[in-house]
UniProtKB/Swiss-Prot annotation:
Expressed by the venom duct. May contain 5 disulfide bonds. The keyword Hydrolase does not apply. This is Conotoxin Cal30. Keywords: Disulfide bond, Neurotoxin, Secreted, Signal, Toxin. GO terms for molecular function: toxin activity. Probable neurotoxin. One of its GO terms (cellular component) is extracellular region. It is found in: Secreted. The cysteine framework is XXX (C-C-CCC-C-C-C-CC).
Length: 82
């Protein structure tokens, strides 16, 4: 019985942690229009093949976003338009 309770506690903790991580990712994505974090890349490099590029942040302007370069952290920024 004790093992079952411990197992349930561990399972609920894993689910909670997963939800929190997904929630933070979703919030960050909404804030910076981030699709995913890129391991490597540069200004204008393709990220997902749908007009995205690797960059450190997205600067929204009109119908598309400009990407700026930062070697420490890469985001995948979605462009809209040209």
């Amino acid at each position: 019985m004790e093992k079952l309770i411990i197992l349930l506690l561990v399972a609920s903790l894993l689910v909670t942690t997963d939800s929190v991580v997904k929630g933070k990712k979703a919030a960050r994505g909404w804030l910076f229009n981030e699709v995913e974090t890129c391991e490597l890349g540069g200004l204008g490099d393709p990220c997902s093949g749908s007009g995205d590029c690797c960059c450190d942040q997205c600067l929204c302007s009109g119908s598309y976003e400009h990407c700026t370069q930062n070697p420490d952290r890469w985001f995948c920024c979605r462009t809209y338009g040209n």
